Amino acid sequence: MTRRTGLIAAAGLALAIYALIFGSSYDQRLLTLSGVYVILVLGYQFIFGHAGALSLAQGAFFGVGAYATGILGARYGAEFLITFPISIALAAGFAALVAIPVLRLKSHYFALATLALSQLLLLIAVNWEPVTGGANGIPGVPPVTLFGWTLTRGLPLLAFVWVLVGLAAAIVHWQLKPSRIAAFTIMRDTPLAAPALGIDSGLLRFRAFLLSAAFGGAAGALFAHTNRVVSPETLGFGVMITCLTMTVVGGRFGILGALIGALLLTHLPEWFRSLEEYYLVAVGILLLVSVIFAPNGIVALLPRRQPAGESSNQPNVDGDAVGFVAAGEGLAVLGISKSYGGVQALDDVSLHIMPGEIVGIIGPNGAGKTTLANAISGATIADQGLIRLGTRDITIAPAHDIARWGIARTFQTPQLPDDLSVSEIVEAAQITATNPNLPSVDTALTFCGLHEYSTTPCGTLAHGIRRRVEICRALAARPQVLILDEPAAGLSAEEQEEIGVMCRKLADAGMAVLLIDHNIGFLQPLATRLACLEAGVVIADDTPDLTLANPRVRDAYFGMAEL
């Protein structure tokens, strides 16, 4: 049992003792309401915490569940075992319906769109009187009834709600396996890297949105059965603000964060009510202090296991590279062009990289080198031309599919989430990998000289080690083609040599390596061929010596035709 699991169990036991021994009927009512909010917050953590999207629709999903229960229960006499799953399905169905247009939006546009959806549902609830009861809502919602047992109030209802909280927590634990948490973290913190690892960010966000809606619908259904009345307030913005505040104060991640936030914010108004007209001020001050001193939630202040510190020993490349290379037929880039507005980034570029080759790409800043890497990896789509991986046309394929088919890459600036450890980062590359016989994480770490850093958070690593981690992550998926975008930038001579040894071993094992860099001293002894780009055009593609002797290359790259 982990320390946090023990804390959750202790919190549950303390709640049970409090309710049984000290709790009045009103206290039991508050604890019941807290349980409803825990479920609501657990759902909101999927989209707001793990997916990193500020959704303002969680209150709307809560309202959909509440109104569905109210209509079915009060109007048609349906019992809990019917209303509960239908409410969940309707909330999730509504989320699925709006997800396609809404999830394409980013940042504040997504927040505004979800807020608009919430307000639309509120208008429908207020004005569709024959169905929703209008401003008066729907009274007479039946209590929870299970197999002839009616749970109206008190300890039986409290116990039932918290049993459902336990079930919701179990579902969260089942959905958030370590590999999926890593995928969410990469998508949220380094969105550029996610598709390059085969992670379908759109599908992951869709899953988070649906789960948040389903939990919201479940919480709304429970609220309707325990409150016995549904009013437009259940669709009001106040529910959304309450949910958001609970999540921020308690913590965006984890069951314990949801427990802390829901329990604290449900009871705070009661604890401060003796202050009469000043209690809202006191609550506001407490929340402000919490956000300032615990920006990641109160749960982040609790002790947690610390990973081992970074070793002071210099890493050394070791091991055989054969296990990191998938059989392939090479990469062909045929006449691709790409423009951004009036800027021609690539102009009829053709390039071939065969297994066992290291093809270097040089060129001045703005020549189109990174655009070429982006077009090959699917991060951008070429306007014309053809790109083939073996016999497969990948010209317009999504980046996450291209990664799964065998093209791995690194970035000019290492794209590594600070909170994940080195081993978690490397393991994340294998979440969606389809290649058989993947190397073990330990094997990849050993080959890249990173084994001593396996438990170190990436945010604490030096720049040179971060470069190495990116390469290790790329190799863990066992690609056919490896694209390295300026891997030597900012490295010492010794670190550059180690990267070079690694590239040579990979090429000797049959990998096709595309090496983009400005450092001629690094590229010349490594590359099988060296191509030079100028203003999006390949002006030379030959052996390194012949390319560097080309007058056009000298003029474009060095600023002089003769040296």
Regions found by a protein language model. Name each.
Residues 1-314:
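Transmembrane alpha-helices and adjacent helix-loop boundaries
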Residues 362-364:
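The feature captures the beta-strand-to-loop junction immediately N-terminal to the Walker
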Residues 377:
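Helix-to-loop junction immediately C-terminal to a conserved catalytic motif
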Residues 438-456, 501-504:
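Conserved ABC ATPase "signature" region
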Residues 482-486:
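Catalytic Walker B motif of ABC-type/P-loop ATPase nucleotide-binding domains
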Residues 523-525:
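A short, surface-exposed alpha-helical micro-motif characterized by mixed small hydrophobic
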